[in-house]
């Protein structure tokens, strides 16, 4: 048997819920099924802001062999689990396939489908969990007004994971990105702000002022895979987004310049890429653009010559 800091059957074991030896003292599931069969609501909460099902899901140990079909039961588990139990989760998905494309909202909180919720949980999400949901009917590209038209991939890209808390370094898990692509994630779908995933990624990476270096490999991959996107959503704006969000990797700029029909002097929101570089005092980027045909005589209130030494 593998060695772990704590015995796998101990009171505080991280493996709790996976073994029959652990499960022998579980709660009586008949009580839970009786709650459900008598209409226990997933939205009516007690003074602690918990509904009956949430209270159950936050128990330390779980052993649900069968549960009545409910519209948001998978969503609720992903939101409220305490110790994640994969065998339990798998049974829950397989017996509630019909609800995997339902959108789960409570008050002002917009959660989306189970895959949206999973994509928001960077500590939990794995390719296998994603495949379980998608193979059983959860639309990989599900989106709706309830999720600000964001796909699960958008949801995954909207927050980072702290990899090194001491230095605040954040990163995307490339294996998760690859799993999205393998499962058919459409990289050309915009959210309600008109951002396809790569543009959303570019903005999200810069949102908190973090340097983009740790994620640049992912951005390069997404740039290359987004070539089929509508020109107005990608080709005609992405260099402006890239430079305006303080990115300096020249290989990404090369990828953008290689897009069919790309105009290095093209305008987006009234500015050319050169304007964006000058605004942020990126002399290296400005010289890169000038060396590749950027027009120094362009309409703008800035006197570009003052910034190019």
UniProtKB/Swiss-Prot annotation:
Give start and end residues of every ANK repeat: 13-44, 110-142, 160-189, 197-231, 269-298
InterPro entries recorded for this chain?
Answer: Ankyrin_rpt, Ankyrin_rpt-contain_sf, Multifunctional_regulatory
| Pfam families assigned | Ank
Q: Which UniProt keywords apply?
A: ANK repeat, Repeat
Q: Does the keyword Cell membrane apply?
A: no
SMART domains hit by this protein: ANK
This one is known as Ankyrin repeat protein VACWR203
Q: Which organism is it from?
A: Vaccinia virus (strain Western Reserve)
